[in-house]
Amino acid sequence: METESDDATITVVKDMRVRLENRIRTQHDAHLDLLSSLQSIVPDIVPSLDLSLKLISSFTNRPFVATPPLPEPKVEKKHHPIVKLGTQLQQLHGHDSKSMLVDSNQRDAEADGSSGSPMALVRAMVAECLLQRVPFSPTDSSTVLRKLENDQNARPAEKAALRDLGGECGPILAVETALKSMAEENGSVELEEFEVSGKPRIMVLAIDRTRLLKELPESFQGNNESNRVVETPNSIENATVSGGGFGVSGSGNFPRPEMWGGDPNMGFRPMMNAPRGMQMMGMHHPMGIMGRPPPFPLPLPLPVPSNQKLRSEEEDLKDVEALLSKKSFKEKQQSRTGEELLDLIHRPTAKEAATAAKFKSKGGSQVKYYCRYLTKEDCRLQSGSHIACNKRHFRRLIASHTDVSLGDCSFLDTCRHMKTCKYVHYELDMADAMMAGPDKALKPLRADYCSEAELGEAQWINCDIRSFRMDILGTFGVVMADPPWDIHMELPYGTMADDEMRTLNVPSLQTDGLIFLWVTGRAMELGRECLELWGYKRVEEIIWVKTNQLQRIIRTGRTGHWLNHSKEHCLVGIKGNPEVNRNIDTDVIVAEVRETSRKPDEMYAMLERIMPRARKLELFARMHNAHAGWLSLGNQLNGVRLINEGLRARFKASYPEIDVQPPSPPRASAMETDNEPMAIDSITA
């Protein structure tokens, strides 16, 4: 009898064991399915669970078993318990996703711990408005205000906060004050000030969503530290939670939460927040192992997008450094004031602007451009037209001895063997000018700063500058010299030794004025030395970039020992305190090369603009250097031509045997008359 009773007991125990094992297996599979469905919302839920279980096993001395690989989700989206819970909550409240978890009155009561402050309400409203811009694009304070005013869900307390904080200036001041406060306190927004119709406005350039979330009420952020209850419909499915561990049934039946509360990324509760029972630091309260499970469902955390990356400590440090390196409003004002002062300093005065206007070409610009294709034939071929452009063109010179296959001559119109050179040469095509007829009469090219009567006629003296008496010439405002430096090359003219240059009587020519000294090659350092010996201080340097007949930079020059020279230098020295026009011209001249050692004619117009109506002297000149208002000295000039009576008299007294032209000079120019007393004083001295 006892045997039958024992057998029946064993059978009952075996059946109970089978049922329990099946139930455990069913619940285990259900848990795995639930984790699989939650993994798309919380990607790191499995590692967080394993970490919690591993920590629990270290305290309970039980072996740790990692979570097995999750199966594919088997539940359709519309039947998923989480989706079902969200749908029921939305039907219950009848609001959007933001009001699904927290009542609006409760959100106001928890807003930053200061629900009665209008600033806190306005900051929360502005932060909520900015967070809704996904993806974020820059906006201004006026747009934010319009969005807040047009919000149908705005409560009277929020509208009153806008009015109270804005005061007499209106709600726009409240929005801008809140933005500035948020930028200064935690750097959650990046702002820039601008003006609209004379009124200052604020532009929001960028936002930090992590920091903006802190402006919202705690319950709205999804990271509460209190065990708040979220009311849910009674139709939410309940499950039996075991008292022996995760996935094992127990004797007590409690409503099973769909997810645990706390941080949405880790799923952990805050540490040590239960009234009784020991909890692990920073982990979820394990039900059935330590303490008691809560007798209510836990609140749902806000979903975290799977593509959102957690900010690293290095990124936070960079944000802090960027915030610290930003200029304050006071620094920006000081910088703006400094820029305005610099602008005022560098802005030309009315006198300087009027002086520069005097030297502009009268009648407009008369510059004529050269065609980039050189000849009319190439111009028509490249443009695909039967008519060439209206720019200046060249014409190829093809002689009987020309070999077109050799290409263009390197020296072009400066070639010294034009009659026998086999390379192609060019000349300016004048057919366009002849067909167009005579040009419209325009005013002279020379600027209207000196008349012909003021400048006077050109004067020159053929002499040996090394032994000529410079003291009879008087003093000059401008001296230009192009010495025949000894550069150890074969030149078509004589040169001067270095010591002869150093001992020239140049100091007697000026007391207050400028000197322009042309140098080349090794003579650059010698020229600087001569300026210092003559009593000048070098202040500038002019560069002449040489171009050929086709307006291209020359590549085969006749000067240069190591490299072909495509430029020349002119040193500028100053003595005394002359009156000059500053900042009129530049220090670069681009001009065509002509005869050997001939300098560009642009120099004469430039020097006239720098010191108009001053006496000007050119040393080592040739006949092509003779210009109105200039006195030229050199050994390649045609005799002596002097117009100024005082200068003629002094020259005849010193050199009676030399004839002076013209025999009866015309009336002296006004410029020579004005400078005559100065010249006599220098001779007397």
Swiss-Prot record:
Region (Disordered): 657-685
Residue segments, region Positively charged region required for RNA-binding: 552-565
Gene Ontology MF terms: mRNA m(6)A methyltransferase activity; RNA binding
Catalyzed reactions: an adenosine in mRNA + S-adenosyl-L-methionine = an N(6)-methyladenosine in mRNA + S-adenosyl-L-homocysteine + H(+)
One CC-aspect GO term: nucleus
Biological process annotations from GO: embryo development ending in seed dormancy; RNA methylation
UniProt-listed Enzyme Commission number(s): 2.1.1.348
Record-listed Phosphoserine modification sites: S664
Family: Belongs to the MT-A70-like family.
Protein name: N(6)-adenosine-methyltransferase MT-A70-like
Provenance organism: Arabidopsis thaliana
Native organism taxonomy: Eukaryota, Viridiplantae, Streptophyta, Embryophyta, Tracheophyta
